[in-house]
Amino acid sequence: VPELAESWTASPDGWTFKLRKGVTFHDGADFTAEDVVFSFNRALEESSDYKEQVKTVSKVEVIDDYTIKLVTDGANPILPNTLTNVYIMDSGWAKANGVEKPQDFAAEEETFSVRNSNGTGPFMLMSRAPEELSVLERNPNWWGDSMFPGNVDRIEYRPIKNAATRVAALLSGEVDFVLDAPLQDLKRIEATDGLTTKTVAQVRSIFFGMDQG
């Protein structure tokens, strides 16, 4: 289901996107083409982790408040798929908080956006302590609430590095959900009342290359 972009069309020199109207950021600011242009230009910055994914984009053009065009330096039929990794920021919020450019991980920089955010999604970030706890609460003004009704009002995300400790927290009821439980623990989890496991096939290939030279 399309989200911030409702439709998109290809042309010889790029892609044109029609943006969803009526979307607001968590602080109430309107989502417009200006935010999309800002976010893509930010993603192209040298310190950005996403610059390789959008490197074929040579320019971002505003057609109107809810239409933008990504001009590419050549044909790129899979660009829309790549764009799912580029997150749209509120340009006004970013400028007000001095995060017009991405943080520089190589220089161990930490900016305001490391612990704060202002998105458009169903959950609002209330607090974040990296490697400790992130707390999110339901966004009462989310544009997609009628299409994707949910039943969760608050999320507490606690990173637990040790797999055994993570599974123990699940079995004791300390946490409600864990990602990627160890294979050897799946049967024990499935045998516990109130717990279920979900598995999916991974979309990847693993190969061994033999040096025959």
Annotate each language-model stretch with its function.
Residues V1-D13, N41, N118:
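N-terminal lobe/hinge region of extracytoplasmic solute-binding protein
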Residues A5, T9, T84, M147-F148, ...:
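Short capping/connector residues at structural and topological boundaries
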Residues T9, K18, E52-P102:
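Surface-exposed binding/hinge segments that line
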Residues D13-T16, R20-K51, K59-V62, V114, ...:
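Extracytoplasmic/periplasmic ligand-capture domains
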Residues A106-N116:
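Short aromatic-glycine motifs in intrinsically disordered, low-complexity regions
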